[in-house]
Curated annotation (Swiss-Prot):
GO molecular function, one term: ATP binding
Homology family: Belongs to the thymidylate kinase family.
Keyword Kinase: yes
Gene: tmk
Example GO BP: dTDP biosynthetic process
UniProt organism field: Actinobacillus pleuropneumoniae serotype 5b (strain L20)
GO CC terms in record: cytosol
Gene3D superfamilies in alphabetical order: P-loop containing nucleotide triphosphate hydrolases
Catalytic activity reported: dTMP + ATP = dTDP + ADP
Identification of the protein by name: Thymidylate kinase
Domain of life: Bacteria
């Protein structure tokens, strides 16, 4: 039986790391064999691309070059890790997937959405997560949390307006989406964890 693909999405400071651990523990308790991934990254080549995407280099990275590197990293991960794991009946828990590009590059960078949809269809076809959990947070709150963790990477250093556009696109993508659940990430850690666990429990009941 094919495994399932669950993805966590959200802005910086939304609490994805904590949420990841909550879901991982819940899936393992349910007897699932879980493979953990992150984007960009997850394969040797994809990790090299991650470094180029997230850190300043001697050469300025254009928005479209950034986008293409993200998709190159993504297809490496999907073809070499995610699809084989699902075929073996394993469950995959991902830190970000294609929705990040739709939100960050389509919303934040304001790259043409037709181009994004064309890239998505060309690279991924109809492959998509079985469940996306989006941790929603006001960008000002999230960035304050992120700054508290230390030095910000190239993406995290974008303007507040960039993140408000990104959040708006996330909401457009997740509202009325049967395969997505929106979690209010500004609640207490305990309540966020409880809401996530409920979403996963509901999914486990219907996952076949």
């Amino acid at each position: 039986m094919r495994g399932k693909f669950i993805v966590l999405e959200g802005l910086e400071g939304a609490g994805k790391t904590t949420a990841h651990q909550v879901i991982l523990a819940q899936l393992e308790k349910a007897g699932k064999n879980v493979v953990q991934t992150r984007e960009p990254g997850g394969t040797p080549l994809a990790e090299k691309l991650r470094h180029l995407i997230k850190h300043e280099t001697e050469e300025a990275v254009s928005d479209k070059a950034e986008l293409l590197m993200l998709y190159a990293a993504r297809i490496q991960l999907v073809e070499n890790v995610i699809k084989p794991a699902l075929a073996e009946g394993k469950w995959v828990l991902g830190d970000r997937h294609d929705m990040s590009s739709q939100a960050y590059q389509g919303g934040g960078r304001q790259i043409d959405r037709h181009l994004l949809e064309t890239l998505k269809e060309t690279v991924l076809g109809n492959f998509e997560p079985d469940l996306t959990i989006y941790l929603d947070i006001d960008p000002a709150v999230g960035l304050a949390r992120a700054r508290g963790r230390g030095e910000l990477d190239r993406i995290e250093q974008q303007s507040l307006d960039f993140f408000y556009r990104t959040r708006q696109r996330y909401l457009e993508l997740t509202q009325n989406n049967e395969k997505a659940v929106i979690i209010n990430a500004e609640q207490s850690i305990e309540q966020v964890a409880a809401d996530i666990q409920q979403a996963v429990e509901n999914f486990l009941k219907i996952a076949k």
